[in-house]
Amino acid sequence: MKKIKIFSLLLAGSLCFTACDDYLTETPKHSLTTDNAVLDYSGAKNAVNGIYGVYETGGSNLGGYLYSYLQCMAGFWTYSNEMYSMSYKQSSSATASQWSQLYDIINTCNAAINGINKLDDSSFPSVADKNSLLGEARCFRGYCNLELLWLYGHWFDKADSPYGIIYRDQTSELSNLMVGRSTVGESYQYILDDLEFAEQNAPDYTTAYRMNKLFAKAMHAKLLLVRGWEGDYAKALTLVNELLANNSGWQMETDLAKLYENGWNSKENCFSHYLGDNTDSYYGISGYEFMYSYGFYYSNKFTDLVQEWLDNDARHDVTFGTARAPETWDTSTKDNILTKLYHRGRYAGKNDMYATYPMRYAELYLMKAELLARTNPSDIQGALAPLNEMRAKYTNPVLEPVTGISTHQELMDAIFKEYVVALFMENETPWFASLRFEHDGKPWIYTLKPEVNFSENQYCWPIPDDEIHAHSNVIEQNPGLE
């Protein structure tokens, strides 16, 4: 990809402020540019709504594809040998689309943020309304930059590591594309600045269709949990406790079947990749979630230990079932398909609820259990309590409490197993857990795929080849992934 192609792709994001649905607003009546896009309050709202339009139609590899790849890396699934073996290199095509899609969304965020900031406060009903729009856009930008760091940066390094993100806070033009990599510490700070602003100013949670204060706080807590620097666990625990104490509409879906039936309409889903406007296309909604609507049928076996956990869990009959093949020509059916995400598949259910679950309410209880276990390791039952509190809330299926835990290692193994089973293929959390939790003195990932040789350098993907070669300035590739 040449420099001019990168420019055209990125600029396209800033020009295409299309509304997602009536729940957002009407489509803008004029062609938007970075100069005229935000002229008044209505334009500011359209600019923010435009972010969702780019995400909806241009984020097809940021849901099931992404989460499935990460869980192949963890050793849960062998669908992609490249991901399972961690053999990706700079020339790999498998990891390029997530990069471009995230930056397209970030570019649209920047157009909205910068346009709103240029408007005088008097253009808005109130300063709070202005900041609410900024909070929504900055939450989106912070979330996308966090995904970039987690995927393409040394998120696991110290602050002075040079392998952070390529941070962009301006709409992309030829004059500003040649940006170098930030340090890991700088990258985290950019992300936290956006998330913390959103925690204070973004809209309250009312629906998983929109960015909101609670999602910003939850992703802030998850960032700290994954990063694990000094003081991070204590701070994350405070944030999680605040979220659990919040009497908002975000809450557990006690009937687990309803969670997956309702998807982005579920009260347990804090934010989701809304796809409801795409029912009229050839493949309908399923066309934007290939892995969920197709991949799980033809590769429906998971690695031995994980398959055993899933098969023997009380949630199995709710999350697995019988389904038809996704191809027109293939009339076969299979048992033990991950129907919580596959649903009926691309053929029989092209417009089924192929939702994503970046942050479910249930995950807060698991985060709290882990954080208590790490900040107060001697209190085993105290750390186990949130996990069992979460399990006790379910009415379909009814889950028995986890018992027989007497050592810290047994506690950590139980929490890890719950992360995997409860959130399987739904988001990136089980992948990070496979690196963070230890078993037999080393991260769980080594137990899950002992035959694979890898190093910490392979905990992230390479920056795509096109990006490296498009820069006139030197962009350092992640070590070992050249």
Which role does the model predict for each range below?
Residues 81-152, 182, 199-204, 351-356, ...:
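Conserved, well-structured interaction surfaces
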Residues 20-67, 296, 309-310, 398-399, ...:
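Membrane-proximal, proline-rich intrinsically disordered regions
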Residues 228-231, 237-349, 354-360, 410-431, ...:
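Extended ligand-binding clefts on enzyme/binding-domain cores
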Residues 126-128, 151-189:
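Short coil/linker segments at helix-helix boundaries
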Residues 1-18:
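Sec-dependent bacterial lipoprotein signal peptides
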Residues 48, 106-109, 188, 195, ...:
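Inward-facing hydrophobic residues that define packing positions of alpha-helical scaffold repeats
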Residues 35, 62-76, 153-166, 204, ...:
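Short, surface-exposed recognition loops and adjoining beta-strand edges that mediate ligand/DNA contacts
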